[in-house]
């Protein structure tokens, strides 16, 4: 059986409602649909920067769907160390979810779900196409002020290094079975063409990357 439907949600930023009734949050964000039981739910990042709320939300919606696929966005890591967040959140997922696939930190995973290959990752961006753009992104985005990695400040060069590894892994997965039905899930936009002209500027490299050739 091939998955009939994919339902997508992202950028819910539930931390703004921390402490609110989780059932009401679920109802507000994902009103029931008659097709849910035959659907794969894709949660493409920026769901909540609070691990317990994040996993509580997913554990509540999980029973309605055939499967859930989740990747963090950049905001999940706000006011956290990425390495610590990954460890704590993985433990919560293992304890409280049954049919959720998740790629945390710099992971890129490929899971076959109902004869569809889901390749999923946050896919951090390269930070821009040149040093000037990378400098502008570093100065403008809060990511590089309130996220840490291994006890040190997260930086654009560190993000760019992660991006190169993640992008290469996605490419390898796609080439390994080009005839498969592939769905690639990322938080950051996989093409600069997806940036609205209204927002076209030198910091687009903090939100999108050049994945047109993949």
Show which residues each predicted segment covers:
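Glycine-rich phosphate-binding loop signature in dinucleotide/nucleotide-binding domains
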Residues: 33-37, 113, 173-180
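Short, solvent-exposed loop/turn segments at secondary-structure junctions
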Residues: 13-14, 48, 75-77, 110, ...
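Short, Asp-centered acidic motifs that coordinate Mg2+ and/or phosphate
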Residues: 6, 40, 100-101, 116, ...
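Active-site-proximal loop/helix segment associated with metal-binding centers of metalloenzymes
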Residues: 119-184, 188-209
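Glycine/small-residue-rich loop that forms an oxyanion/phosphate-binding "nest" at active or ligand-binding sites
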Residues: 82-104
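Short acidic low-complexity segments
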Residues: 34-36, 101-112
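N-terminal active-site segment of His-dependent metallophosphoesterases
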Residues: 1-71, 76-84, 146-153
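Beta-strand-turn-beta hairpins that frame and shape the catalytic cleft
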Residues: 1-7, 109-120
């Amino acid at each position: 059986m091939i998955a009939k439907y994919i339902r997508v949600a992202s950028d819910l930023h539930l931390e703004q409602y921390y402490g609110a009734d989780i059932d009401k949050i679920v109802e507000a964000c994902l009103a029931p649909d008659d097709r849910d039981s035959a659907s794969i739910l894709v949660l493409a990042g920026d769901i909540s920067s609070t691990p317990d709320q994040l996993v509580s939300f997913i554990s509540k919606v999980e029973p309605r769907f055939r499967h859930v696929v989740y990747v963090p966005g950049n905001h999940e890591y706000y006011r956290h160390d990425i390495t610590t967040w990954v460890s704590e959140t993985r433990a919560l997922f293992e304890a409280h979810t049954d049919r959720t696939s998740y790629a945390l930190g710099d992971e890129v995973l490929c899971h076959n779900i109902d004869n569809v290959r889901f390749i999923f990752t946050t896919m951090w961006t390269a930070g821009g196409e040149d040093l000037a753009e990378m400098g502008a992104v570093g100065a403008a985005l809060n990511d590089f002020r309130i996220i840490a990695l291994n006890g040190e400040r997260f930086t654009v060069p560190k993000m760019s290094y992660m991006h190169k590894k993640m992008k290469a892994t996605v490419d390898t997965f796609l080439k390994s079975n080009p005839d498969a039905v592939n769905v690639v899930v990322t938080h950051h936009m996989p093409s600069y063409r997806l940036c609205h002209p209204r927002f076209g500027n030198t910091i687009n490299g903090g939100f999108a990357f050049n994945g047109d050739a993949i």
